[in-house]
Structures are given as structure tokens and as C-alpha cells.
């Protein structure tokens, strides 16, 4: 019974991400020295961003191999800079390190931010954990807070400075038919095994 409930939850989250009419707000490249490490894109349903606006989606496309556990540490360090509770960040780090896979070039990690929760999608797999509103706000602030260490990326991420980069690179193409909004059950990729896709 628990497995059935979990599977229904994952399908609901997957449906939310697919049925939202995502429009690009902006995107930016994160570099370290001469290396292009990843690109990050911001999407909303209005092609613009305002404070406390939901839903939002952040898409990270990796250009270099990155271990999932190390990327989780990077995110938590940014959150700790916001002076959040250590109890919160410790729990968040543990959970992200449990669910994040290792990332290869061209992999996508999406974070869908809803008003009271958020969740990650790695390529076409919903990662099995719902984060609360506090985590969701902290994740948004990593990229958009005035105190963020990524503040130099914000003009492009918010669409205030244009880039020649194509937003289509943030589109992952799963091996399934397009989502039919009239169908409450999206078609999953061939050979989809819910047991293997319940990460964490």
C-alpha cells in the first residue's frame, strides 16, 4: 500500500512539471576559471519573474562531470550563507546526497518550485523526495537573492541581459510521447520500472 501511494505521488509530481506551460525567463553560464561547468535556466508560466511567484523551474545543464554528493554540498554551502538553521541544512544535505545521481555532460537537473513544496527531476526521473517551502525558498535564493554569490549571473538569469544561448538546450527529450493534458496519467518511458525509479 505504501508503494502504491508513493508511486501515485511521483506520477502527480511528474504531471505537474509536464502540464505547466513553462516559458523561458533567462539563462546564464556558470564558469570556473576557463571552464564552463554548467548552464542554469529560469522558467515560469509568464516568461517573467516577480518575488514570491510560483510555479518556477530552475534547469541546470551540466557541461562537466559532477558527483551528485559534491553538488549537494555546493548547494548547502550557498544556503548556509543565507544564515539558515544548521539543523535544516544538515537534514537537507543528507537527503540530497541520498537522491542525487552523479551528473555527466548534457545531463539535466530541474527543480520545480511550488508555493508550499519543491522537488527535483533528473533528466526524466522524478527524485523521490518532496522538499518543504523553507527549502524551496532557500533554493530560489541561491540564484536570485541579492546576497547570492551568483549575483553576477542574475541579469541574464532574470532576462535583463540577453544571451545567444538557445533555451532548447534545457529541454530533455524523454523516450515517450508528449504529455496529453486531458490524460491524468502521463505515458512513461518504455521499460519504466517504478521500483528502480524510486530514488531514495
What is the predicted role of each segment?
Residues 1-3, 20-21:
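Absolute protein N-terminus
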Residues 20-200:
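Terminal leader/tail segments of proteins
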Residues 14-17:
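N-terminal signal peptide c-region/cleavage motif recognized by signal peptidases
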Residues 2-10:
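Sec-dependent signal peptide recognition
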Amino acid at each position: 500500500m505504501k508503494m502504491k501511494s508513493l508511486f501515485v505521488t511521483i506520477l502527480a509530481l511528474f504531471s505537474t512539471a509536464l502540464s505547466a506551460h513553462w516559458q523561458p525567463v533567462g539563462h546564464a553560464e556558470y564558469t570556473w576559471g576557463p571552464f564552463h561547468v554548467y548552464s542554469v535556466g529560469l522558467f515560469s508560466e509568464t516568461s517573467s519573474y516577480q518575488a514570491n511567484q510560483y510555479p518556477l523551474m530552475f534547469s541546470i545543464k551540466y557541461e562537466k562531470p559532477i558527483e551528485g554528493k559534491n553538488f549537494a554540498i555546493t548547494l548547502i554551502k550557498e544556503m548556509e550563507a543565507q544564515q539558515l538553521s544548521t539543523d535544516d541544512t544538515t537534514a537537507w544535505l543528507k537527503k540530497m546526497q541520498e537522491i542525487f545521481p552523479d551528473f555527466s555532460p548534457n545531463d539535466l537537473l530541474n527543480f520545480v518550485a511550488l508555493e508550499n513544496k519543491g522537488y527535483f527531476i533528473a533528466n526524466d526521473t522524478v527524485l523521490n523526495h518532496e522538499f518543504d517551502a523553507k527549502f524551496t525558498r532557500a533554493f530560489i535564493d541561491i540564484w536570485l537573492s541579492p546576497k547570492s554569490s551568483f549575483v553576477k549571473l542574475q541579469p541574464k538569469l532574470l532576462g535583463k541581459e540577453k544571451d545567444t544561448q538557445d533555451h532548447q538546450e534545457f529541454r530533455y527529450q524523454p523516450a515517450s510521447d508528449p504529455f496529453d493534458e486531458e490524460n491524468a496519467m502521463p505515458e512513461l518511458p518504455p521499460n519504466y520500472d517504478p521500483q528502480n525509479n524510486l530514488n531514495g
